[in-house]
Design a protein with these regions (language model features):
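Histidine-anchored nucleotide/phosphate-binding helix
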Residues: 9-26, 304-319
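Conserved nucleotide-sugar donor-interacting segment of glycosyltransferase catalytic cores
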Residues: 118-182
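Conserved N-terminal ligand/cofactor-binding loop architecture of enzyme catalytic domains
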Residues: 21-120, 164-265
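Leloir-type glycosyltransferase catalytic cores
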Residues: 181-232, 403-471
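Catalytic donor nucleotide-activated moiety binding site of glycosyltransferases and closely related
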Residues: 313-357
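Nucleotide-activated donor-dependent transferases that construct or modify glycoconjugates
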Residues: 2-12, 34-36, 105, 133, ...
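Active-site donor-nucleotide binding/catalytic segment of nucleotide-sugar enzymes
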Residues: 280-309, 314-316, 329-333, 438, ...
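A donor-sugar binding/catalytic signature common to diverse glycosyltransferases
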Residues: 134-135, 160, 358-405
Length: 471
C-alpha cells in the first residue's frame, strides 16, 4: 500500500517543487493544502505537473461569520490534540501588528480558529496521511496543523534554514537534532576557536539572507512604479477572501506604506545619531542581540518572551554591580521599519545598558563580552564559536552544547551569570556539535533556490500575479 503524503504549499513554492521531484522516484499518494492568493490559485487549479490526489485551498475554507464561535468544540479540540489555542492566536502577527488595516474582534479570531481546526481535522481524518511535509511554521495556522500532525503520530518533516548558510535542514522537531546519538563519541575536526570562527564566517546565514532574499523592486523608482501599478491597475479579491488581507483597501495600503517610509527614514536618523558605533570596552559586559520583530523565533518559538524590553530590564537587574548590558539592534529590523523611537529611548534610559548601532560588528561584541544572552536565536550558538557561555530562554537544537544554558526562572539569573563568569568553553565541544550538525543537514541552498523562484515568477512589480505551467 502506497504511503500518503500531505504537503502544505506556502507562497515560496518550494514544497510544490519538492512534490514534483518526489513523485518521480517514490511511489506514493500526494495531497496538498495551498495558501496561495487569488491569482496564482488559477495555476494550482489547473496544473498537471504534480499528480496530487486532491488539493485544498486554505483560504477558501475561512469565511467571515457573524455567529458565535463554538467554544465547546474548541475546548474538546484543545484537549484532543493537546494544543494551547490561545497561545497560538494571541501571537499571530496578522492579529497583533496590522490593526491599522483591520482590527479583529475576539469572536472573529475564534471563528477563524474554529474553521481552521475543523478544516484541518477533516483532512487528517479523511486521508489519514503517513507523512506531513511543510516548512517550519511562521503563522499560527501553519503551527496548528504542524502540532496536530505531531501530536497524532503523523511523521512530520519540516524544512528550515540552519545555523549555517548554504545548508538546509529537514527535521521532525525544533528543539533537538533528529540525529543526536553520538555527541560524546563522534569523530570531529580538532579546530581552534579562531579556526571555528573562520568556518562560521564562511557560512554566515544572516549575511546570505540579506544578500539573496531582498525582494525585487528595491530601488526608490521601482517602489514608486510598483505603487503606481498597484493603485491604477491592480484588482484582487484577496481583501474579501483572505483574512490576512482584510481591510487592505488601496487607500489604506497607500497611506500605510507612505507613513511607513517616512517613519523608517526618521527612525534611521535617530539610530544614526543616538546608537553607539564605537566602544573602548572598559567595562565587563553581557551581550544581548535584539531579535527581529515580527519573527517566528519569538512569536511561535518563544511565545512567552515577545516583550524584549521587559527581558532587557530583567537581565539588567540581574547583572553583577560592575557589569553592563550591551544591546545591539538587529540589522534586519530595517525590513520592519525599525522600532519606535520610544522603544530605543526606553532601552537607553536603563542605567547599566548601552545600545549599539545595527552596523556595529557583532564579532567585536562576541570577542569582548563575558556572556551572551539570547531568547531563542542563533546568538547562543555563535557565542560558543567565540568561546563564550550563553543563556537562552528556551531549549534549542544547540542546547546540547555544555556552554548553552536554558534559564527557567529569572530569579535564578543573577546566580547563573556569576556561575558562567568562571565557566570555560571547550573548543572540542563546539567541534563535536559541528560534526553532529553536519550529519543532520543537507547542502541544499534554500535561500538561493527561493531567490531563483522569485526572480523567475515574481520579478514584476506586483507579487500577487498569475503564473503559467509553461514557465
Amino acid at each position: 500500500m502506497s504511503d500518503k503524503i500531505l504537503f502544505l504549499l506556502t507562497n515560496d513554492y518550494t514544497h510544490y517543487c519538492l512534490a514534483y521531484s518526489l513523485q518521480k522516484i517514490y511511489d506514493c499518494k500526494m495531497y496538498a493544502i495551498s495558501e496561495v492568493t487569488s491569482r496564482p490559485k488559477i495555476f494550482f487549479q489547473s496544473q498537471n505537473l504534480v499528480n496530487f490526489e486532491n488539493t485544498w485551498f486554505f483560504h477558501d475554507q475561512i469565511k467571515k461569520k457573524s455567529t458565535n464561535p463554538d467554544l465547546d468544540y474548541l475546548e474538546k479540540f484543545e484537549k484532543k490534540y493537546k494544543i494551547n489555542l490561545w497561545k497560538l492566536v494571541q501571537n499571530e502577527r496578522i492579529f497583533l501588528y496590522f490593526k491599522n488595516f483591520y482590527k479583529f474582534t475576539s469572536d472573529e479570531v475564534l471563528n477563524i480558529l474554529e474553521q481552521e481546526c475543523r478544516f484541518f481535522e477533516k483532512i487528517l481524518e479523511d486521508i489519514k496521511p503517513d507523512y506531513f511535509f511543510t516548512r517550519l511554521p511562521s503563522l499560527h495556522h501553519q503551527e496548528l496543523i504542524y502540532q496536530m500532525c505531531r501530536n497524532t503520530g503523523i511523521k512530520t518533516l519540516a524544512m528550515n534554514y540552519t545555523l549555517l548558510a548554504k545548508k538546509c535542514m529537514i527535521s521532525e522537531g525544533t528543539k533537538k537534532l533528529d540525529y543526536d546519538k553520538e555527541f560524546d563519541s563522534i569523530k570531529y575536526q580538532d579546530r581552534s576557536f579562531d579556526e571555528i570562527q573562520k568556518y562560521l564566517q564562511s557560512f554566515d546565514l544572516i549575511k546570505q539572507l540579506e544578500e539573496k532574499l531582498v525582494k525585487p523592486g528595491s530601488s526608490k523608482l521601482e517602489k514608486l512604479e510598483s505603487m503606481g501599478e498597484y493603485l491604477l491597475n491592480f484588482d484582487s479579491v484577496n481583501t474579501e477572501t483572505h483574512y490576512t488581507y482584510y481591510g487592505r483597501t488601496k487607500r489604506k495600503v497607500f497611506f500605510y506604506y507612505l507613513n511607513d517610509y517616512l517613519k523608517t527614514k526618521m527612525r534611521k536618523s535617530f539610530i544614526d545619531k543616538n546608537l553607539k558605533l564605537n566602544s573602548q570596552f572598559n567595562d565587563p559586559f553581557v551581550y544581548f542581540p535584539l531579535h527581529m520583530e515580527m519573527e517566528r523565533t519569538t512569536l511561535i518559538g518563544a511565545p512567552y518572551y515577545v516583550n524584549q524590553i521587559e527581558i532587557i530590564k530583567n537581565i539588567a537587574k540581574s547583572l553583577p554591580i560592575n557589569f553592563k548590558l550591551y544591546i545591539k539592534e538587529h540589522p534586519g529590523q530595517v525590513n520592519r521599519g525599525w522600532r519606535n523611537k520610544s522603544e530605543y529611548k526606553e532601552i537607553m534610559d536603563i542605567p547599566n545598558v548601552v545600545l549599539f548601532h545595527p552596523d556595529f560588528p557583532k564579532d567585536t561584541l562576541y570577542k569582548n563580552c563575558s556572556i551572551v544572552f539570547s531568547i531563542a536565536g542563533t546568538a547562543s550558538f555563535e557565542a560558543a564559536c567565540f568561546g563564550k557561555p550563553a543563556i537562552t530562554l528556551i531549549d534549542l537544537i544547540h542546547s546540547i552544547l555544555p556552554s548553552v544554558h536554558t534559564l527557567k526562572n529569572f530569579n535564578d539569573l543573577h546566580d547563573l551569570i556569576n556561575q558562567l563568569l568562571i565557566e570555560k568553553v571547550d573548543s572540542k565541544d563546539v567541534n563535536r556539535f559541528l560534526a553532529l550538525f553536519e550529519k543532520n543537514v543537507s547542502n541544499f541552498d534554500w535561500s538561493d533556490f527561493t531567490k531563483k523562484l522569485s526572480d523567475e515568477f515574481f520579478s514584476g512589480k506586483i507579487q500577487d500575479i498569475e503564473i503559467s505551467e509553461e514557465k
